[in-house]
């Protein structure tokens, strides 16, 4: 764990200050340019939201040595998930094509059933009409 209170460790304080300062500048820039009426609650939501975004950018890009381990961990995790997903999709390409064919066939069959039930309804109406008007 990083000890932020050590005097030799001023670079961490600089990073924290620049991070918070960037967030505040960005938020008030957004408020000023959009001229949105802001309450304390909405400003707090903005702060939390953009801090999460900024931290995720640090984590993904690894902009400093402090964040490199976290960034590489995030990148490895994302790449593993992506590669396994791609592998799964390429393995199941034929399965997907089969599934799409089954869905099309199901829709065709459902439409046929609906048409046949409509035809039956029309036939019974016609028979009823004939009975009444004989």
Curated annotation (Swiss-Prot):
Give the record's membrane topology. Multi-pass membrane protein
Gene Ontology terms, cellular component aspect? host cell membrane; membrane
Entry keywords, A to Z: Host membrane, Membrane, Transmembrane, Transmembrane helix
- What name appears for this protein in its UniProt entry? Uncharacterized protein ORF5
Spell out the subcellular localization from the entry: Host membrane
Q: Which cysteines are joined by disulfide bonds?
A: none
Residue stretches spanning the membrane: 16-36, 43-63
To which protein family does this belong? Answer: Belongs to the plectrovirus ORF5 family.
